[in-house]
Each structure stands twice: as structure tokens, then as C-alpha cells.
């Protein structure tokens, strides 16, 4: 059951190296603490190899790239591969600019990535060289819906097999595949889109799940997606008059903090294809 995955995070307290963006860095740190992990942030090229060496996994997020941070990503990634640590790539805004797209593609080509997690437009850009990324958000034209679900499942399965990485596409319907099995997940609330950084938070948390569950990375990735979506549902259910997106953000983090195996197993909404 997926609940075992979050219990393993709480037992092992995995230290995660995050090279993430400055928009959401604090929220990424807090959700890692909430799920039972431990965060450390560093993008400086002269620092990252030492930091990666003391951690269990690496979360690479390209949301606010600089020449220095790009160098740091490759240095940290090579060190993580050397140590056989899981690496997650979050290709934020791939398709929105040449720099983002090229950086994400080069990271895919030069590093062994455990998971690639993004919205459908970002993933389509990496897989097909096309996609209609709207800033850092997925375009509605790319959305995974009940009508397009079978096609989307086939797409994510094929890209996972081709890339050699688990691929997680998050949106109204989430898909997580290793090239063979595909989890179709229906947790979450549309209001989560009114909070910046829920995807970045998920990437950080998912990396902790990967570290703590080394024998089943696919299930760990799916469990992280269900945890985040279920936290969104729980947080929304606790809203009060006058609450806005800032309060909702905190309620999501609180819901992750209080999540246990039983709550996750009862609330996770998924099927495996």
C-alpha cells in the first residue's frame, strides 16, 4: 500500500539536496520537513558536490536559471550519479524559453534521472519538441482529461520507456509511469492552481519518498503525488470564511505534516493500468 512509503520517509528522515528556484524555496523546505524529510539548499558550483555527497537524493528544479546554477546542476547531478543517489528533474517552464528547454534536454541526456516530473506541456516539450507551455503553467490545449486519458497514458508510458526514467505528469489527472505500469491518480483540488509552487513542493517531497523507498521508486513517486493531492483536498475542506490562497498554502503543508499511512491509504484515489 502507498501508506508504507510515507511511513518510510518518517522513519528514515532522508536529507534531500535541492537546487530549486528562489520563488518557492521556502515552501519546498517546509513541505520536506512536513513529510518527515530534511532539506538542504545549494546551487553554488563550488559547494554542490560536497552537499550532494552528504545527502540521499537530489532535486533539480530549473525554474529560475542562472549560468552558475546550471553549472551547479550538472556538477551535483554527476556526483549523485556517482553515488547512485536518486535524481528528480522538474523542468519548470520547458518550452517557454530556449534556455529552459535546452538545459532540461541536456540534463536528460547527460545524467541518469530517476524521475522527470512536470506538467503535460513541459513533458511534451521534452518528449516531442513541442507543447504549449504558458509561462510555467500547462496550456489548456495540452490538458489530460477523461476524453484524452487513454492517449495520455500511452504517451507517458512511451516516454518513460524511451527516457529510462519514471515520468510523472501532474495536473487535474496525474499520471506516473515507469514505461510499463501507469498510475492514474485523481487526488487534488483545482484551487491548488491558485498557489504558486505546489508542483515545486511536490518535487522536493517526491525526492524524499524516492530516497526512503529505494526498492520501489514507482510506488514512491505515486505515493508522493497522492499525498500532495490528498493534502490539497484536506486543506480545502478546512477553509473558513475569509481564507485565501495564503492560508490554503499553509493548510496544505499542515495536512502533509499530519498525514499518516492510514489516512493516505484511505484517501488515495488511483488505478494502475
What kind of region is each of these model predictions?
Residues 194-226:
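Short, small-residue alpha-helix embedded
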Residues 230-273:
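Charged C-terminal helix
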